[in-house]
UniProtKB/Swiss-Prot annotation:
Residues 1-89 form the PTS EIIB type-1 domain. The keyword NAD does not apply. It is an enzyme of class 2 (transferase). The lineage of its organism: Bacteria, Pseudomonadati, Pseudomonadota, Gammaproteobacteria, Pasteurellales. Its EC number is 2.7.1.192. This is PTS system N-acetylmuramic acid-specific EIIBC component. It is a multi-pass membrane protein.
Amino acid sequence: MATIDNAMIHSLIQHLGGKSNIQSVTNCMTRLRVTLHDSSVVDKDELKKIQGVLGVVEADEQLQLILGPGKATKAAEMMKASLGDNMSSPSLQEIARTQKQQIKSAQTSSIHQFFAKFATIFTPLIPGFIGAGLLLGLATVLQQAFVAGVENPNAFLVDLIAYMKVFSKGLFSFLSILIGYNAAKAFGGSGVNGAILASLFILGYNPEATKGIYSGLSNFFGLTIDPRGNIIGVLIAAIVGAKVERWVRKFIPDSLDMALTSTVTLLIMGCFTFLFIMPIGVYLFNGMSWLFSNLNGNPLGTAVLAGLFLISVMLGIHQGFVPVYFALVETQGFNALFPVLAMAGAGQVGAALALYFKANKGAVLRDQIKGAIIPGFLGIGEPLIYGVTLPRVKPFITACIGGAAGGFTIGLIAYLGFPMGLNTVFGPSGLLAIPLMTSPNGVLPAIATYLLGTVVAYATGFITTYFFATKDVDLS
């Protein structure tokens, strides 16, 4: 298994065009994201040959190197240290060339770029989703096993369960504010303005209500205020608010920017939110909930969703499903779509295992799979996608078939009257998702359904790859 060391970082910098060509370095869970002055001087073929690089992806103005979980963070830190103060300012010619590349990219892939921004909104929240979801899952298991139906349950256990659940309640009570903050920043506005606009969807507008925080407004100049629309409305308000803020800033003198830009932006966007975004958000939210609720209850629909999910990951638009997750949690009480889509990763694992057994002992492919299979079991599929199945095409297709089979299984069980889903908006997939499963019938039936779908996806991905996707495929 490749390690991140100084020699590897030196090779990466060399084939990225040298230190002077690197503008900035960031990372996510599995990718090293490098912003370059000139992407034309990058040697992508040599980058792919470096031990430990599982794939190279071009997205927006970034070059993304797939390294795997944990390794991306270490590589980013080491590369920043190596670059030091050598990340030079670009020349006028370089600026012009970069602007031209960005404009061309915007003309050809604006939809992809829009969905890519969702990653910057939701990715920072994922650890919190996972932590709160795991605690809620464990608390639910303890409650059903030792408290439900017990005449005199242990007082300490009751308090412990309540304590473990409080984090999930806190997360969901104020999650809209976090999303509003991140969304505004992602689209070029001030995060705090996005958070304030998001709070309009949380506040109450009924002075007689006994729950929530009363806003002090019972109507908007005589018009009824309906703060429904949930995350859809929050996203629209924050994104439009960022655009309005940038427009307002053009007319505000620099000396008054701090005092007036946000003031004017909030006045405009508050009115726009109450009059248009909230009503529209309700219809969009309800329509999205209806569509995916019906797809989830249809085994053919779940098969299609699971089968196509790897393609959405490959295109970088899979973050677009996150608003749907919120809609499902709001309407159903759990995220029924997430475990269906997680079957795509299970199909990928099955396909990779088939390639491992088909490859000869000592083959480089076997070493690649060894390094990526454990993260694959734990729900991190990018190393397998970009390093193993996608470059060989046929195994990628059979991995999608495996995911479709797992999705069909979960959809069929839901169709028979036993729906299930994730107990939080977002969480880990793979085997790590097991304790987060829930259903109206209890936690254990939900876990059993998820495991059955996963096994079916593993098996289908393995069998279809082993028998139909290795001929004329590079197994070296």
